[in-house]
Amino acid sequence: RQRQMCIRDSDMDATIFGDPAGQIPRMDTLSFPADEKLVKKAVAANEKANPDIHTFTGRVVSGDQFISDKDVKERISSLFHPMCVEMEGAGIAQAAYLNKVSYVIIRAISDKADNSATMDYPTFEKKAIAHSVRLMKELLPMI
């Protein structure tokens, strides 16, 4: 299922000032939309390079925490309705937005933050590296 790819900051809470959750004060936007052309190219490249894995697009939220607590996961899910939660994308997206630079965030998801992971992290890491290398070899010539 495809949705607009964008990044939001899950840690930012200036709601006491009337801002919505995730709004960075004095920013003129609530989220940082990724470049749609780059998203389409990344999806096409990944589907060709890694047909064995699923590709999803949509809202990504970033925060300065590993999500391992069920209540934190549910709070973030109910506030932001993300496809995934990670730690780095909002900083990259905000810098790209402020400098008017196109960007796309590509993530390999290791777990669902609910103790249901089916492989250990070292195994996941090796697979993610192999998938990432194949993806980049396919994507870079396209951009």
Q: What are these language model-derived features?
A:
Residues Q2-I7:
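Short, small-residue-biased leader/transition segments that mark boundaries at the very start
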Residues D9-C84, A95, N99:
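Active-site rim beta-loop-alpha module in soluble metabolic enzymes
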Residues F32-K40, K70, E86, A90, ...:
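Electropositive phosphate-/nucleotide-binding environments in soluble metabolic enzymes
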Residues K41-A45, R75, G91, H131-E138:
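Alpha-helical scaffold segments in soluble metabolic enzymes
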Residues D71, R75-E86, A90-E125:
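Active-site-adjacent mobile loop/cap segments within catalytic or ligand-binding domains
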Residues A113-I143:
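His/Asp/Glu-rich mid-to-C-terminal helical/loop segments that flank catalytic regions of hydrolases
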